[in-house]
């Protein structure tokens, strides 16, 4: 009877998981094996032709490279900044609640609103960056129109938004640590850096693994800002994989190829998550 009761408790969650996760993933995989149907030409089975087209698509490789550099720039920076902010606001400092709120505020703002705020920074001539640069005689620069700077500009905005969110997890982890550890280290004459390196950081590894996985997923799913800032330009210099999927599906109406791109994205995220668990799991628990 207990066995049946357990399955009954599990059933609602299992139905939702299958309906909103497993079934869409399986349907997407199936769609990637067919051509895009039209009113005069029905969809037909093409096997791996869509994947062959993907391998020969230069835009796919460009946006995949963009996403790689975007992840490489945003993930470690936002995690390191979040950890530093959490350590600082965990100390006894004046107006600590106000500082915490200030750090967390970007997180609760919609990405579209954040993009509009940063658009004011980057707008040529009238933007904040150019206004400050003009005070020092620096020429105006089209930050979002230059292929060499546009991706870095979007990275800075995402780091500003994401760091406060990750800070909350690190702050909760820091507050769960026993204060006796720091007291004992102080009595033994350990420096703050030594205590952080040998005690605090190892104890934060479970939180770091959680944050790392979430940051990796976010680096591939956060594309709302592109609709406001660049629309993937110039010349796909700021386009990311998920935004390219959106363009293929809803601008070019090639749903089969969009499904192929989605399958690649799912496999990529699953592989990265497994790799992170395999590499980081060994250092998660402090002995």
Task: Specify the residue positions occupied by each region the protein language model found.
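A structural signal for multi-pass alpha-helical bundles of membrane permease subunits
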Residues: 2-287
């Amino acid at each position: 009877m207990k066995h049946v009761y357990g399955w009954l408790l599990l059933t609602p969650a299992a139905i939702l998981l299958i309906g909103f996760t497993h079934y869409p993933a399986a349907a997407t995989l199936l769609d990637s094996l067919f051509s895009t149907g039209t009113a005069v030409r029905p969809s037909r089975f093409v096997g791996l032709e869509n994947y062959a087209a993907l391998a020969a698509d230069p835009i796919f490789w460009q946006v995949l490279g963009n996403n790689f550099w975007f992840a490489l720039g945003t993930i470690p920076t936002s995690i390191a900044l979040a950890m530093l902010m959490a350590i600082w606001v965990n100390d006894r400092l004046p107006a600590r609640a106000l500082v915490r709120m200030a750090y967390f505020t970007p997180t609760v703002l919609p990405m579209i609103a954040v993009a509009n705020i940063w658009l004011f920074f980057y707008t040529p001539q009238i933007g904040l960056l150019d206004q400050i640069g003009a005070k020092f005689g620096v020429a105006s620069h089209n930050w979002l129109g230059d292929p060499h700077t546009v991706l870095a500009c979007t990275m800075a905005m995402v780091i500003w938004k994401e760091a406060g969110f990750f800070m909350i997890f690190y702050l909760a982890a820091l507050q769960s640590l026993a204060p006796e550890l720091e007291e004992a280290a102080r009595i033994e004459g350990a420096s703050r850096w030594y205590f952080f390196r040998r005690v605090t950081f190892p104890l934060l590894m479970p939180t770091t693994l959680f944050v790392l996985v979430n940051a990796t997923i976010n680096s591939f799913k956060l594309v709302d800002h592109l609709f406001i800032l660049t629309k993937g330009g110039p010349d796909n210099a700021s386009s990311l994989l998920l935004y390219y999927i959106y363009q293929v599906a809803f601008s070019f109406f090639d749903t089969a190829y969009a499904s192929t791109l989605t399958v690649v994205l799912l496999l990529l995220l699953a592989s990265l998550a497994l790799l992170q668990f395999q590499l980081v799991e060994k250092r998660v628990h402090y002995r």
